UniProtKB/Swiss-Prot annotation:
Function: Secretory calcium-dependent phospholipase A2 that primarily targets extracellular lipids, exerting anti-inflammatory and immunosuppressive functions. Hydrolyzes the ester bond of the fatty acyl group attached at sn-2 position of phospholipids (phospholipase A2 activity) with preference for phosphatidylethanolamines and phosphatidylglycerols over phosphatidylcholines.
pH influence on activity: Optimum pH is 7-9.
Family label: Belongs to the phospholipase A2 family.
Record lineage: Eukaryota, Metazoa, Chordata, Craniata, Vertebrata
Binding-site residues, Ca(2+): 47, 49, 51, 68
Enzyme class: hydrolase
EC number: 3.1.1.4
One Pfam match: Phospholip_A2_1
Name used for this protein in its record: Group IID secretory phospholipase A2
Keyword check for Iron: no
Tissue-specific expression: Highly expressed in pancreas and spleen and less abundantly in colon, thymus, placenta, small intestine, and prostate.
Span of the signal peptide: 1-20
Organism: Homo sapiens
Gene Ontology biological process terms, A to Z: arachidonate secretion; CD4-positive, CD25-positive, alpha-beta regulatory T cell differentiation; inflammatory response; lipid catabolic process; negative regulation of T cell proliferation; phosphatidylcholine metabolic process; phosphatidylethanolamine metabolic process; phosphatidylglycerol metabolic process
GO MF terms, alphabetically ordered: calcium ion binding; calcium-dependent phospholipase A2 activity; heparan sulfate proteoglycan binding; heparin binding; phospholipase A2 activity; phospholipid binding
Amino acid sequence: MELALLCGLVVMAGVIPIQGGILNLNKMVKQVTGKMPILSYWPYGCHCGLGGRGQPKDATDWCCQTHDCCYDHLKTQGCSIYKDYYRYNFSQGNIHCSDKGSWCEQQLCACDKEVAFCLKRNLDTYQKRLRFYWRPHCRGQTPGC
């Protein structure tokens, strides 16, 4: 089990930095929450990280489920959520998405901004036991968007 987890982290560490939108999200979450996303959030609960199923486990997991819905909507609009790179500024604890990019880039930034601040609002209920949560335990109906 530990070896599989380590392999998963190595794969994720190799994928995240080379993809545009994911690179933005990773940086934004780190700036807003102060946590290293690849260790704290991408393998968290039933919805944080790649894919998602079942009932979210806590408020942090709900942030990720809502973010999944935001990305799903952008995909239906033809946006390349994992490749589009957007510009934003982080200043005095706030995020300002640039209005110079395409519609998809602006909306992608808005989705990522929302999840970053949602995660920050729920830092006090973050549960270490939900990091690296075993996804087969994610049961129940997946909430709709």
